[in-house]
A protein has these predicted regions:
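C-terminal cap of thioredoxin/glutaredoxin-like
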Residues: 58-71
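ATP/adenylate-binding site constellation spanning eukaryotic-like Ser/Thr protein kinases
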Residues: 7, 47, 65
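Conserved helix-turn-beta segment immediately C-terminal to the redox Cys motif
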Residues: 17-36
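Local sequence-structure signature of Cys/Sec-based thiol-disulfide redox active-site neighborhoods
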Residues: 1-23
Length: 72
């Protein structure tokens, strides 16, 4: 399962979600503004900005269609 860590009013977060929805990829959304307990997890992974997209050991930040394709 793919997890997208998002924030409110995050344009790249919206783009990543739409990209995955358009391709029928199932994903879980965790909004860091609404669930701040996940912020520490994101920081431990080495990231400071949303979106952070995680599937197993494959984790990256930002909207990157090339990296998103690797999830499929």
């Amino acid at each position: 399962m793919v997890t997208i860590y998002t924030k409110n009013n995050c344009r790249q977060c919206m783009m990543a979600k739409k990209w995955m929805e358009h391709r029928g990829i199932e994903f879980e959304v965790i909004n860091l503004d609404e669930s701040p307990e996940y912020v520490e997890h994101i920081q431990e992974l080495g990231f400071k900005a949303a979106p952070v997209i995680e599937k197993g050991d494959f984790v990256f930040s930002g909207f990157s269609p090339d990296k998103l394709r690797q999830l499929v």
